[in-house]
């Protein structure tokens, strides 16, 4: 049987050969599709999506097909690093997605897709287009976000990617709002009784181990914002605020402003409070960000094609010199043309320090 177990503290899903009958039916269905074929696997958390992906990839390899896998479960990534969508090509049998060598990544910048629908859809689209050039079958493993906004996210992915087959792992028709209208390309599969459920704390611990492993053998690299494209933040958009404007804002709100930009008629400032107490700030006029929250912020290091070559942790920033000091395991920095700011703070030991709302930065 296929089992979901915790092994060495880093992964949940592993391959075995005994599977429910409907998994064989799924493999037969995929084998009969016109190639290249794209298959999207959906289901709630802890329904065996990754386990199914592993089984199908191994079975299809045995049948002589070229297979690729897109791991888009940003919060429970098997193909490192977290907070990205990753593509790997399968050239031999394997037992865990962690065994695969990633070919390309797309940076999302957080471990929850709720405020990042654009990145989630575009990332899977770009990687699927790339994968189809070299694969007979593209298997897309997805997040367990299937309720509320998750319905719209899954439907947007289906509309954008146009999969040839949707494999729906469900218990009691909970996927109906997602697959309604796509029944002709959907195959429903039952959730195995052997699937293990993981608590929030267990998931966080799994992520901690993966962050820690990813940042092993990292080094500090310096980037200059004047020499590289910086996205995912308003910090370097618009024009610098004038000294008089800076002084006025500091007096009004009891701030020390370390960096400020004027974006049309609005201001964006990075500040430190100089006194305690409440402040009434019209965020339609002034957006502000606490300097301390820049520490250990996750950054994506992108190439000219928009693919993520790896991620880094912001360790220091010098606004006057435009200098960013980034801890990263990425070796070839020469191909990095863009730095994209994420919305999770994490240390290199894997400890997550918190998520940021998309609009704050």
From Swiss-Prot:
**GO MF annotations for this entry?**
ATP binding; ATP hydrolysis activity; ATP-dependent polydeoxyribonucleotide 5'-hydroxyl-kinase activity; ATP-dependent polyribonucleotide 5'-hydroxyl-kinase activity
Its top-level enzyme class, in one word, is transferase
Q: Which residues form a coiled coil?
A: none
UniProt activity-regulation remark: DNA kinase activity is inhibited by 250 mM sodium chloride whereas RNA kinase activity is unaffected.
**Pfam families given in the database record:** CLP1_P (PF16575)
Q: How is this protein's function tied to pH?
A: Optimum pH is 4.5 to 9.5 using 24-mer 5'-OH DNA as substrate and 4.5 to 6.5 using 24-mer 5'-OH RNA as substrate.
Q: Where, by residue number, does ATP bind?
A: 43-50
* Disulfide bridge map: none
**Keywords carried by this UniProt record:** ATP-binding, Kinase, Nucleotide-binding, Transferase
Gene Ontology BP terms: RNA processing
Q: What is its EC number?
A: 2.7.1.78
What are the required cofactors? Answer: a divalent metal cation
Thermoactivity = Optimum temperature is 55 to 75 degrees Celsius using 24-mer 5'-OH DNA as substrate and from 55 to 85 degrees Celsius using 24-mer 5'-OH RNA as substrate.
Outcome recorded upon mutating residue 73 to A = Abrogates kinase activity against both DNA and RNA
Q: Its domain of life?
A: Archaea
Write out the catalysed reaction: a 5'-end dephospho-2'-deoxyribonucleoside-DNA + ATP = a 5'-end 5'-phospho-2'-deoxyribonucleoside-DNA + ADP + H(+); a 5'-end dephospho-ribonucleoside-RNA + ATP = a 5'-end 5'-phospho-ribonucleoside-RNA + ADP + H(+)
Q: What does this protein do?
A: Polynucleotide kinase that can phosphorylate the 5'-hydroxyl groups of both single-stranded RNA (ssRNA) and single-stranded DNA (ssDNA). Exhibits a strong preference for ssRNA.
| The protein's name in its UniProt record | Polyribonucleotide 5'-hydroxyl-kinase PH0197
Give the source species: Pyrococcus horikoshii (strain ATCC 700860 / DSM 12428 / JCM 9974 / NBRC 100139 / OT-3)
